[in-house]
Amino acid sequence: MSKGTSSDTSLGRVSRAAFPSPTAAEMAEISRIQYEMEYTEGISQRMRVPEKLKVAPPNADLEQGFQEGVPNASVIMQVPERIVVAGNNEDVSFSRPADLDLIQSTPFKPLALKTPPRVLTLSERPLDFLDLERPPTTPQNEEIRAVGRLKRERSMSENAVRQNGQLVRNDSLWHRSDSAPRNKISRFQAPISAPEYTVTPSPQQARVCPPHMLPEDGANLSSARGILSLIQSSTRRAYQQILDVLDENRRPVLRGGSAAATSNPHHDNVRYGISNIDTTIEGTSDDLTVVDAASLRRQIIKLNRRLQLLEEENKERAKREMVMYSITVAFWLLNSWLWFRR
């Protein structure tokens, strides 16, 4: 018996020495890991909110207090179904805010928004700010509007004719008709008859004449009509300058030599007479102003495109000349080097 008891005591000592008891910190770490694993498993597998969250370390008194209904032991997790503003003007500390009542009682007016277009094309219609002041519909306005439509259609047809080279032929006819009378020609007069040629002035020249500037047009810039008249006059002036430059550049090509240095007085007299008659006959209606401004704007856009094409052609020609010059210089340098090597 003594041997058995001594052996048991020796085994207990060896086991205690080989496997020491865990400390309090190790026990706390083990419990924390176990709690985290259970918490993660409950969230990931069962997908539910935990019933409670402990706010104090585990203690027997707290557990007993929780069982007795003490609220300090844990916090019950409850997700509310809805959130309502506390108070209905019954409690002074939790009264209903006045801003909420104001927001709910204020009716919201719907806003009519128009989607802007992706592409703005000036050739289809004039700008919207030109139609701010529309006069009341009267028979006179209808007649003026019809005249404006006729002018627009006529200008479009004349643009097509000018693209086909009619302007060059008319210009040559002006110089070849020496027996024609040298007086002022109006759009509303009969065409000039000559023994060989018959020349009819183009109404397109009457549209490119300088505008008739009234003194009140420049001063009355506070109204929309004054702004429209200023835009029209400045646009016509710029367009006339561009046409003069193009005429000067075109004269050496069409007539060449000495004819390019001198201008045609008959042509200048005709243009001057047409400009004077046009300034006296042209009305002051808003519709005609809008039509003229839109047509002049389209013509200026076309001229700008032509000038851009000419500039691009000049740049390409300069590049080609530079490349050819470089190739020529390199060729002669190579030939000279080979000649010196011999």
Swiss-Prot record:
GO terms for cellular component: mitochondrial membrane; mitochondrial outer membrane; mitochondrion; peroxisome; protein-containing complex; synaptic vesicle. It is linked to Encephalopathy due to defective mitochondrial and peroxisomal fission 2: An autosomal recessive disorder characterized by delayed psychomotor development, severe hypotonia with inability to walk, microcephaly, and abnormal signals in the basal ganglia. More variable features include early-onset seizures, optic atrophy, and peripheral neuropathy. The modification Phosphothreonine is found at residues 115, 200. It comes from Homo sapiens (Human). The modification Phosphoserine is found at residues 155, 157, 172, 202, 229, 233, 295. Homodimer. Interacts with DNM1L. Interacts with C11orf65/MFI; the interaction inhibits MFF interaction with DNM1L. Belongs to the Tango11 family. It is found in: Mitochondrion outer membrane; Peroxisome; Cytoplasmic vesicle, Secretory vesicle, Synaptic vesicle. InterPro entries: Mff-like_dom, Mff/Tango-11. Keywords: Coiled coil, Cytoplasmic vesicle, Membrane, Mitochondrion, Mitochondrion outer membrane, Peroxisome, Phosphoprotein, Synapse, Transmembrane, Transmembrane helix. It comes from the Eukaryota. Residues 1-322 are cytoplasmic. Residues 291-322 form a coiled coil. One of its GO terms (biological process) is positive regulation of mitochondrial fission. This is Mitochondrial fission factor. Highly expressed in heart, kidney, liver, brain, muscle, and stomach. GO terms for molecular function: identical protein binding; protein homodimerization activity. The chain crosses the membrane at residues 323-340.
